[in-house]
């Protein structure tokens, strides 16, 4: 179509023809300035929104914020389980979505564009949970606020206890725990009415924890531990006031609330709990589980697809068992190798928990000499190694807690040793690579040191976090840490656990498997004794979908590495690949894939 000129356009053309040269140059310059101003405005609006979003998250759930290293709200517990607070939080999220979509993404700098995409993903994911009443299930054997705060009492966890302010902050939380318990009881009563209750099996496992928290007198309470460990540097007045405060709070507020909770669980809640196993037995349970799967894997994989991936991985790893078994002196069928290993006394060499910790410390020292060849980007924050507090040992597994961003707490690898004579040695190398370095510590401590918005510095997703840690285990082979067949078996056995999780999690929550089916499958495939298979199964019952992120995330990172190696050939650098993966903190897997693909294209 032939263009036409209006009178207005002709007049403009005439004016431009007669204008001085400087005026012609001023127009583009003015346009650029306006565009730059708009871009700056978008950047300011985005940064303001990102800060508000994270602060809202931290205030809504201050305990989780503290676990992630943000100690600003260590005197608060939040009341995220209160229905009105939950509704208000979802309303906030909806407002944030509107504000986010009003910002021009293309006007942002590349790193802000990534943050924009992550925030968009997080908000959409959070809002998918709105129809499902998670607040009606505030307690399980795996986690609850009373047990978390009890674990903080020694000052070694995510709640520091070194200053008067710290002691007051923890006491403040104890004062708020009674109302939280009463809200939890009210929620669970509502859950009973609506058919949203926990499986009876996991609550029977949880009950002893809560009975144990009820003390005969304040001084016997685990929550009184800080008052028994007041630093000598505190003034006499502060010591007296703090001790009196802890004693009064426990006697008049906390202990009665804990007694109410234990009695409610035993006499009212557990009798009303369901005998079914999976999440799909709940109202809207299958839809609820699908949202959990998407959240935990950051993918659109369906349960059946994940189930089949798990079965395929189980078969692959059993093929490796067949190869490594004879090197360990085992000549039976491959599937029986884990059971045989458990029966060998030589793989249970410990007499004390300190001996276990000493092996990890030796391994940590060894890694300090090997990791620089694989990583140029490493955290500055140190990693400490500690034994798990006694209260939580029965239900805890070895794990990592992040450092405090203010430097008051290092990253910590916690070793859970219930009975040192039964602590197996074959899995120690791969476990430490996962929970310590270069697994969780390299990822999470480094993320806190990067120049990122707080919602990324302290946030994340399960598929990347656990996927990276499981991928980190595979690096043991390149560092020569699996040269002994028993150590390589330990790595394979941990891989097998993550593959089995894909099978049993989807089996129980999407395919109608019973608790007993899962226990039997784990015993046959992993060689676990009944007690361990039961506790693992009950973990997946309490945390539907959580165990899926490990293998799904790890497989994606390995896929991306193989893609980069094939595309770049001699130009491929493993330290650079690790920098690309870790260099912007946690990403949903789709965004990680785009980032690696860009690096491949730029590096060719």
Feature map (PLM): residue ranges:
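N-terminal maturation segment of proteins
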Residues: 24-604
